[in-house]
């Protein structure tokens, strides 16, 4: 597969600044995992609720209303401490529209801190646990010895082989792509 460069992108923009501030506080207080867990729970609620998505994305609500509604939601789902205070601050500052990106950036900073690289592996059929573990080892070696977390996807249209995405790099070893390349070459020839 050749050497795969793993990038440790620095978070940028408004969402990056908020995420960096939250991450620094979480690291200082030793609560990185708790904050990550709380943010993940909020993200799941956000994904499942179109009403919450509209509420967070709408400038029609005052910051006071957003803080009150989010405070009630956070209490109901038992998100407390640093994560809850952060979310309420974001609402107060009228930056809720950027919350999903802030969560992504926080998770990226956490991964960098813990030496975790995320990979997506797409195959034509589900991979066995042993295959995933072997792939983790290969990707860890390619990624400079970092721990690799794999998100496995299945796409029967690939016919066979794998597509591996590690950071911004992608290696497409699928049979579908190889057959398409052969088809293209045959059209060029004849």
Curated annotation (Swiss-Prot):
The yes or no answer to whether the keyword Cell membrane is present is yes
- Assign the protein's first listed, main location to one coarse class: membrane
Protein topology in the membrane: Peripheral membrane protein
Q: Give all cystine bridges in this chain.
A: none
Q: Which GO terms describe its cellular component?
A: plasma membrane; proton-transporting ATP synthase complex
The protein's UniProt keywords, in alphabetical order, are:
ATP synthesis, Cell inner membrane, Cell membrane, CF(1), Hydrogen ion transport, Ion transport, Membrane, Transport
Q: Which compartments does it reside in? A: Cell inner membrane
GO MF, one example: proton-transporting ATP synthase activity, rotational mechanism
The keyword Cell inner membrane is annotated on this UniProt entry: yes
**What does the protein in this record do?**
F(1)F(0) ATP synthase produces ATP from ADP in the presence of a proton or sodium gradient. F-type ATPases consist of two structural domains, F(1) containing the extramembraneous catalytic core and F(0) containing the membrane proton channel, linked together by a central stalk and a peripheral stalk. During catalysis, ATP synthesis in the catalytic domain of F(1) is coupled via a rotary mechanism of the central stalk subunits to proton translocation.
Q: How does it assemble?
A: F-type ATPases have 2 components, F(1) - the catalytic core - and F(0) - the membrane proton channel. F(1) has five subunits: alpha(3), beta(3), gamma(1), delta(1), epsilon(1). F(0) has three main subunits: a(1), b(2) and c(10-14). The alpha and beta chains form an alternating ring which encloses part of the gamma chain. F(1) is attached to F(0) by a central stalk formed by the gamma and epsilon chains, while a peripheral stalk is formed by the delta and b chains.
Query: PANTHER family, from UniProt?
Result: ATP SYNTHASE DELTA CHAIN
Similarity annotation: Belongs to the ATPase delta chain family.
Name assigned to this protein: ATP synthase subunit delta
Q: What is the lineage of its organism?
A: Bacteria, Pseudomonadati, Pseudomonadota, Alphaproteobacteria, Hyphomicrobiales
């Amino acid at each position: 597969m050749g050497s795969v460069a793993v990038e440790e992108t620095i978070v940028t923009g408004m969402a990056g600044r908020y995420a960096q501030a939250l991450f620094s506080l979480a690291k200082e207080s030793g609560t990185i995992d708790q904050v990550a867990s709380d943010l993940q729970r909020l993200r799941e609620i956000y994904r499942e609720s179109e009403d919450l998505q509209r509420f967070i994305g709408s400038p029609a609500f005052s910051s006071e209303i957003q803080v009150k509604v989010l405070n009630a939601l956070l209490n109901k789902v038992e998100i407390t401490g640093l994560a809850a205070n952060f979310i309420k601050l974001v609402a107060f500052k009228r930056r809720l529209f950027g919350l999903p990106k802030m969560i992504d950036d926080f998770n990226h900073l956490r991964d960098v801190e813990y030496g975790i690289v995320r990979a997506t592996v797409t195959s034509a059929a589900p991979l066995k646990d042993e295959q995933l573990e072997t792939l983790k080892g290969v990707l860890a070696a390619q990624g400079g010895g970092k721990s690799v977390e794999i998100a496995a996807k299945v796409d029967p249209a690939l016919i066979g082989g794998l597509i591996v995405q590690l950071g911004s790099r992608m290696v497409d070893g699928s049979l579908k792509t190889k057959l398409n390349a052969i088809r293209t070459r045959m059209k060029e020839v004849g």
